[in-house]
């Protein structure tokens, strides 16, 4: 269980930590916060396609394309995702040679449909985007055993300059 202290029961008067248009300063840089995409619940990862469109993953298990100021409906072709607690659809990353091979990699909490309770584990899948859905899905990693604990799934993805994939998996 998690213990959160100091959070009032009535949260209607709480203000955001930073407001859009507000300036955030660090020791070396100033940033301006601006909303680029609205209508997302918990956006987790994003990747820019060569044509300028942006793929956005949401923890709740949806993947969208953002283009010309518009957010697409959720794309089809995703695997079964355990979108509970800290689990869900997590990072997304294009293969370094995406322009030639079309591979998109994403991390997620894979739902174990055989378990009597919602259970799963961290997984990495790659797929190709065709129209409004993912195709050619291939699971390249899935942690075992599954767990019914809904936290610590990781999972960022990166490639080195030789095309090797690296990912963090948390406790899973």
Which positions does each model-derived feature cover?
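Acidic, Gly/Ser/Thr-rich repeat motifs that build Ca2+-stabilized beta-propeller blades
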Residues: 1-172
């Amino acid at each position: 269980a998690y213990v959160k202290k100091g959070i009032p029961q009535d949260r209607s008067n709480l203000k955001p930590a930073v407001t859009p248009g507000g300036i955030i300063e660090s020791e070396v840089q100033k940033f301006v916060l601006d909303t680029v995409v609205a209508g997302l619940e918990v956006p987790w990862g994003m990747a820019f396609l060569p044509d300028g469109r942006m793929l956005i993953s949401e923890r709740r298990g949806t993947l969208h394309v953002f283009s010309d100021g518009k957010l697409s409906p959720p794309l089809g072709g995703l695997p079964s995702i355990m979108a509970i607690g800290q689990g869900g659809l997590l990072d997304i990353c294009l293969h370094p040679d995406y322009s030639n091979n079309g591979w998109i990699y994403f991390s997620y909490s894979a739902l174990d449909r055989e378990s009597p309770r919602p259970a799963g584990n961290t997984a990495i899948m790659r797929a190709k985007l065709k129209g409004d859905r993912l195709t050619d899905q291939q699971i390249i990693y899935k942690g075992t055993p599954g767990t019914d604990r809904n936290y610590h799934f990781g999972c960022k993805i990166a490639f080195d300059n030789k095309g090797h994939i690296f990912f963090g998996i948390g406790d899973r």
